[in-house]
């Protein structure tokens, strides 16, 4: 068993709240996608607020800013969930459901197995990407870094570009 797991944050700003017709498709899929995440190979944890998701959490003063965080056993398990399982079909609606961001909206980083990242950790990883690009501390699927005991150059990957953080 690895001593490291991979953490992921994905943020977005919705054009309207839960009752807005423009984002109804997002909310209609939310429970199904979360249930799929919970049983996906390699799944360890996902951020949950008062309900079954993180929608009620307010990581910033903006009530339309949403955060999703998860931890998986390894980068391949996370990649397969995001890009190869049913989640990818839902992410195709991202342009309709979320405003375009001029900053990084997704970051990955390694955490010690058993540790869970905080919202502050996640927001700081996005800041690192915006200010310094991919590094061992925060990276993307396109510039993936190996686990800390084997840090070296980024491993270039080629996932669908419409669903990747900016850095």
What role is predicted for each listed range?
Residues 1-63, 104-167:
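Short S/T/G/P-rich N-terminal loop/turn motif that feeds into the first structured element of a domain
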Residues 62, 75-104:
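An amphipathic, aromatic/His-enriched active-site/gating alpha helix that lines ligand/cofactor pockets
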Residues 67:
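A basic- and aromatic-enriched beta-loop-alpha substructure that forms the phosphate/nucleotide-
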Residues 72:
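Exposed, tryptophan/tyrosine-rich binding patches on extracellular proteins
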